[in-house]
Regions:
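Short, Lys/Arg-rich flexible segments
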Residues: 1-108
Length: 108
């Protein structure tokens, strides 16, 4: 009796990688959008500068506005007005669901 075996490990690995990248992108957009809603508005520059970047295994949400850290964390004269950290913290459950859904769909 002859038994043959064909591995699909490469396909499964590629499917999981694509699912993770899609989940990262979806999650980054979620947090970025929430941070934009939370960002204090004076000129609107801070809010409009928020963006995201997705790499293979991480997503970065941030801004290039020089004064953003002072808004998020405070100065000696100005109280903190956090917008990034709360956006991430408040969406952790949704992010977990996004990843679970994308991974589950990759296994179908």
């Amino acid at each position: 009796m002859k038994v043959s075996y064909k591995s699909n490990a490469d396909k499964v690995s590629a499917d999981f990688k694509r699912a993770a990248e899609k989940a990262l992108t979806t999650s980054a957009l979620l947090v970025e959008g929430d941070a934009k809603l939370r960002a204090p508005v004076d000129t609107g520059n801070l809010r409009s500068s928020l963006n995201h970047k997705v790499e293979t295994d991480r997503a970065t949400i941030g801004t290039n506005v020089e004064y953003a850290p002072f808004v998020e964390f405070s100065t000696s004269r100005t109280p903190a007005q956090p917008f990034l950290e709360p956006a991430l913290r408040e969406n952790k459950g949704k992010i977990q669901k996004i990843f679970a859904e994308h991974i589950r769909n990759a296994t179908k």
